[in-house]
A protein has these predicted regions:
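N-terminal entrance/gating region of PLP-dependent enzymes' catalytic architecture
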Residues: 1-47, 373-415, 419-424, 442-451
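Active-site-adjacent bridging/hinge elements
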Residues: 2-14, 32-44, 102-103, 134, ...
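Glycine- and acidic
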Residues: 15-23, 45-51, 80-84, 108-115, ...
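Short loop-beta-helix segment that forms the pyridoxal 5′-phosphate
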Residues: 37-66, 111-114
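Conserved PLP-enzyme active-site core in the AAT-like
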Residues: 65-254
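A glycine-rich phosphate-binding loop feature that marks nucleotide/adenosyl-phosphate handling sites
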Residues: 182-186, 313-317, 330, 334-344, ...
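Conserved PLP-binding catalytic core of the aspartate aminotransferase-like
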Residues: 332-378, 399
């Protein structure tokens, strides 16, 4: 977060704006569309419009509901009928099944597409699933693609996905095309580097720059976005804004009809001054304006180039952290191939503890609980997290329980990261001693799978 965005959110709350309709929402709805249009133009969508909402899960819900309405227009009035499925990347967010259930599609009708060893949706697997669905008489409403996840920055090659889909549609002479949505609530900030933005960052032009190489790879994976229908944005993740502040951004305004009740169609009159009514297409009627104003201030204050420089510095922070891990040789980085700025690492516990028939998984969870208890009592201690069932190099046969550190501050130095790692290492020794003395028991509670 930055003070200007926090101040903007507080100001909107102080004015107590409800962005339900333009007649009494002031210009909040206009600002909302200015934000969506700005974001859309970063990927070449000159007619982009969108919806400010509360969290990435809602952006996915808007996308899937739009897809269902586009495929099955009568479903807006008559409900869902027939055999319909949505696809989602295996490495994508876990909430898609829940959304399918909430929208009446059914969680069993969310099919996960296996990933390759790069963490991307496998094109061959996608084609096989499309063929299977078609053979079973099912229609594919939407394909939800990962646009950068919290762990491993799983990110599809959008150009390849589009080519696979278009080829299948043409070959089978389908009367429809599956809706393509990019779940880019983390990765959206890299859109600032498209259309020549990367070359405008002087630091990326240094030969052999590892950060620049990752950024180039990310930009290449986003090269097919012109053919997608929508994407998601979380300003509270990588946009320097307070919680919660998300956007569903569509390539055009068709979503306004697709998210309606099926009985109203938008016309040019709806966009005349004072006429826009957001309640016709939003899930909520009570819509605060704090996220809208905060995101607009972020765009005006930092701009496209400023946000691009910010994500570049976060990537540099990752390099500094990785160097500290190698320098201290206390832990082992596991995600060397990630394109993101997060660091997943392994903590080796004392061998005598493992010889007691205690698995690394049990020790890791008990250690994480030990560290959380420290922070809960007010001790100044680094905030890091645990990653159960982590696939090393995206290999389903090589799974462990790992830990996660994500640089969020752009000014941390070598000394800062050395302190962070020393603190974790010192508590590891304390934990092992207490575990031997049976002052710490095994963790019996269930740890959720990684938040993606």
């Amino acid at each position: 977060m930055r003070p200007p965005t926090v101040a903007a959110a507080n100001l909107a709350n102080a004015y107590n704006i409800n962005s339900l309709m333009e007649a009494f929402g002031g210009e909040s709805l206009l600002v909302e569309q200015k934000v969506a249009r700005t974001l859309g133009k970063w990927v070449g969508w000159d007619q982009a419009m969108g919806i400010a909402c509360n969290g990435g899960k809602i952006t996915l819900m808007y996308a899937i509901r739009s897809a269902l309405s586009r495929l099955l227009p009568d479903s807006q009035c008559q409900g869902l009928t027939g055999e319909t499925v949505v696809f989602s990347s295996e490495g994508g967010h876990y909430c898609v099944e829940h959304i399918a259930s909430q929208l009446g599609l059914g969680s069993d009708n969310c099919w996960r597409v296996p990933s390759n060893n790069a963490g991307q949706m496998c094109p061959k697997a996608l084609l096989l699933l499309m063929e299977r669905a078609h053979a079973q008489g099912k229609k594919i409403a939407a394909i939800i693609c990962a646009g950068g996840t919290t762990i491993n920055f799983n990110c599809e090659d959008t150009r390849v996905i589009h080519e696979v889909v278009e080829g299948f549609v043409s070959r089978e002479a389908l009367s429809y095309r599956p809706y393509l949505h990019l779940d880019s609530v983390i990765g959206w900030v890299y859109f600032t580097l498209l259309q020549g933005g990367l070359k405008r960052l002087p630091a990326t032009q240094l030969p052999g720059n590892a950060v620049a190489q990752r950024l180039e790879a990310i930009c290449e994976r986003f090269s097919g976005l012109a053919h997608f229908d929508s994407f998601g944005v979380d300003f509270h993740k990588t946009g320097l804004c307070p919680y919660n502040n998300s956007y569903f951004v569509s390539q055009d305004r068709r979503f306004m009809d697709e998210l309606g009740d099926g009985k109203y169609r938008f016309s040019e009159r709806d966009f005349e001054p004072g006429q826009l009514r957001a309640y016709r297409y939003t899930f909520e009627n009570s819509r605060g304006a704090s996220g809208i104003l905060s995101s607009w201030v972020a765009l005006k204050k930092f701009g496209k180039q400023g946000l691009g420089a910010y994500i570049f510095r976060l990537q540099q922070g990752r390099e500094t952290l990785v160097a500290a891990i190698k320098r201290q040789a206390l832990f082992t980085q596991l995600n060397e191939k990630t394109l993101g700025h997060e660091v997943v690492f392994l903590i080796p516990f004392a061998s005598d503890l493992s010889s007691r028939c205690v698995t690394n998984d049990e020790l890791a969870k008990a250690f994480m609980q030990h560290c959380w208890q420290l922070t809960n009592t007010g001790v100044q201690f680094p905030l890091f997290s645990i990653v159960p069932n982590y696939r090393i190099n995206n290999d389903p046969a090589d799974v462990t329980t790992a830990f996660l550190l994500t640089p969020c501050h752009t000014e941390l130095t070598n000394d800062d990261w050395d302190w962070v790692l020393r603190q974790i290492a010192e508590q590891k020794v304390v934990f092992e001693t207490r575990y031997r003395q049976r002052q710490i028991s095994q963790v019996s509670e269930h740890f959720e799978r990684p938040i993606k």
